[in-house]
Amino acid sequence: MPLEPEKHEEILNMLLDPELPQSERTEALQQLRVNYGSFVSEYNDLTKSHEKLAAEKDDLIVSNSKLFRQIGLTDKQEEDHKKADVSETITIEDLEGK
């Protein structure tokens, strides 16, 4: 887990001290190096996760679109079928009127 921004800033400010002993300077630089490594690792993991989720989202959008089109076609076919049933119905009034 990368350092908190405040902790990172604290280490950088500590390194500005010209009287800082070499051992503490080395330790601070090592902390920054480790922090950078963990930051890059976490960034790469999050990038891969984001790419995977974006691809899944795109697949879901396509699937959803297909389902809506299929439902739309089914509903239209049902409406057409109902209209056809109604138009084929002959009543006694229709026969008497002709």
Curated annotation (Swiss-Prot):
It comes from the Viruses. Residues 40-62 form a coiled coil. Gene3D superfamilies: 1.20.5.400. Keywords: Coiled coil, Late protein, Viral capsid assembly, Viral release from host cell. InterPro entries: Gp7 (IPR038032), Phage_phi-29_Gp7 (IPR024374). Disulfide bonds: none annotated. SUPFAM superfamilies: Head morphogenesis protein gp7 (SSF90246). The keyword Coiled coil applies. This is Capsid assembly scaffolding protein. It comes from Bacillus phage PZA (Bacteriophage PZA). The gene is 7.
